[in-house]
């Protein structure tokens, strides 16, 4: 039996010495460490990885830096796409229409490539939205919803050769006991007996906790998932015997307090909440900087480079020196008297202690900040170890500094000085100091053009970030495939499928060939420039832009701004016939105060004067928009952009 004795003595400047004795002689208080991971999704957050690093060999470098077995992430959680907005954009569903299975969602490709780097990494999945054919809610027909979810797991197993470690219920929305029971049944019937169910998955779970602990339900699921808990887990939940995860956490701007938030949260979750696993949102900001929550992940990608963020480097202090399955020692973890925390991990042979003394202001998180507290300017910490015969000393690294070796004294003590706003490790292992990884992006062409010929069936178009509905490539065309509103996670009142792409030059032209098939329920197409429409808040802010809508049934053309509550600028009839079932080429661009609209290959353009107020409002907005006026199939080809001086 492994035994460890740790004594921690704090000597604070100018005050009497205080001693905090911790005596561990067995693993009776140890808990299994489930790992630190990240979420891909919750809004197509990894989408542009496949645009900027289109070659698999280039992506391998990126994913190696995030998931290598030596110091990478230990869990990967992905969104189960539902064709609807889920923060940064939509993720394509694997079954947008009942019985029509799509197997090339980019998350499947991401999982496959991550598993080539780390074949044993656990994969978890959670829906944000659901396709509309399921009903008004996921719980209208629990069997149908469970079968829909299990179909995703089947694709993973049968097509992409991975097993799903855990599956959630519905992101940050109410759960249903009857659905969870049915999901367990359907999982087992399809050979997924080992797949765990994560229940909860919400903010502010006061009522949810009592339901989760109901003796008639508590054995129907495996993990209690909590989002942004800040370590605040009720005592009865901590003592319930259920595994508790922060199944979504972090999401804090790395340009501000992200690094400190991560350092504090990693420890506080366990010390305050008995939380043994943490999954950070989001894996990478692989979306346009114009979209919300940019640089609130563990890495970022733009047209110039991939780069890891400091929050990930903090996390790597643990992932480099602690593995899933190690034990967290409850009685060897706690708070320093002068502020700050320490958590001890061990595998019975080696040990790692993560320490942090982050101040309140330097560790604020977007969602889970505590009440104000105070940390002493510096603290002298004396660790005392005994009953570990092979133990000679500890390697220490603080704040990404070089490693230092501290030999234990005759009485098995090691003394360190911890200033405020410090974080790092003491470990029996050689120290791997986290460092930033930067990988240059392959050259991105100045002008965009795509004929959609070199795609797998149902692969998602590059560069475009759908914000409502979903585009996939089929037979050389980008198809908006959603025919009815989804069970929405946000933007539930929006009935306009649309996608956005950032443009690189101010004076830009958008060209597209578009067909609305005869059988489609879509009635019009929309092109837009100088827009800021993205994310979940478009209804609140009434997102802006300069948009052109062409109705196929009556040739009516409407120019408008303000996407939700439209401000009409002009209306007129197109000069040429526009029919369903035929492709037409459309172009729009803005020159000074004039919007030019071009139909087909004709040289004649229609010019509309844009009011100065609308020009001023959209002057700094840089998103192109494509879409349809309502749900229904539309086909897009030869989309391109040009710019002029």
From Swiss-Prot:
Reactions the enzyme catalyzes: a beta-D-Gal-(1<->1')-ceramide + H2O = an N-acyl-sphingoid base + D-galactose; a beta-D-galactosyl-(1<->1')-N-acylsphing-4-enine + H2O = an N-acylsphing-4-enine + D-galactose
Protein name: Putative galactocerebrosidase
Disulphide-bridged cysteine pairs: 261-365
Signal peptide start and end residues: 1-16
Top-level enzyme category: hydrolase
GO cellular component, one term: membrane
Organism per entry: Caenorhabditis elegans
MF terms in GO: galactosylceramidase activity
Its job: Hydrolyzes the galactose ester bonds of galactosylceramide, galactosylsphingoid base, lactosylceramide, and monogalactosyldiglyceride. C.elegans contain specific sphingoid bases, which are unique or different in structure compared to the sphingoid bases found in other animals. Two examples of these distinctive compounds are: 15-methylhexadecasphinganine and 15-methylhexadecasphing-4-enine.
Statement: the UniProt record of this protein carries the keyword Transmembrane helix: no
Keywords attached to this entry: Disulfide bond, Glycoprotein, Glycosidase, Hydrolase, Lipid degradation, Lipid metabolism, Signal, Sphingolipid metabolism
PANTHER family documented for this protein: GALACTOCEREBROSIDASE (PTHR15172:SF1)
Sugar attachment sites: 141, 174, 193, 274, 395, 411, 532, 616, 620, 638
GO biological process, one term: galactosylceramide catabolic process
Gene3D superfamilies assigned: Aldolase class I, Exo-inulinase, domain 1, Glycosidases
Active site: 172, 248
Keyword presence, Signal: yes
Binding-site residues, substrate: 87, 128, 171
EC number(s) given by UniProt: 3.2.1.46
Pfam families cross-referenced by the UniProt entry: Glyco_hydro_59, Glyco_hydro_59_C, Glyco_hydro_59M
UniProt family annotation: Belongs to the glycosyl hydrolase 59 family.
